[in-house]
Amino acid sequence: AANPALGQLMSRPAVAVRYWFHLENLAQTVFSAEQLEPVIDRLVGDYLPRTEVDRLKSFAAKRREFVLSQIPRELTVATGLAKRDGFFFSDSATATLSGQAPATTTVAVEANGQAADWFAPEARWQAKVTLRLGLNRLLVRALDADGNEVARQHADVWHGDAPTRPLGQRLTRSARWTAARPLLVAKPLVV
């Protein structure tokens, strides 16, 4: 923020979530067309030409829509990894996840059960997670002030060598699988 004191205040998740909440609330109530336009009509009356009054109302509506468009409303997850066959692939044993969370309710984000770095003024988060060999279903949760889940998303990340041949059909003969290499069951497997 341009104002250091305001920046320090907004860096507190409990303050930032209330800021986002009230910003949205004001846009939905006081600055809604239903409430603001009668106020403009009452205050301006016949003092300004109708075109100027309409311009004021149009400006207020556009400003309101812009403000609402700046408020993150959904939990998003980005991996920065290449995607193949429906999975993200990582050669590394760690992956960095990032995204946004619902700004008006979120005070913390967890990635795979661990606290993510939460940048409250932007409703943005980032986390480094450890991957096991094979398919990792990573759970990201946005939490409110009481620790309740607000939203959740999954990211499926494959770590290590991809299976040479996805399994998923009828087994017609004996098969021996070991933990030395990950297996991917892509279709129903009939034994």
Question: Can you describe what each PLM-predicted range is?
Answer:
Residues 58-191:
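Low-complexity, disordered linker/stalk regions enriched in Pro/Thr/Ser/Gly
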Residues 1-94, 99, 170-171:
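Middle-to-C-terminal accessory/interaction subdomains
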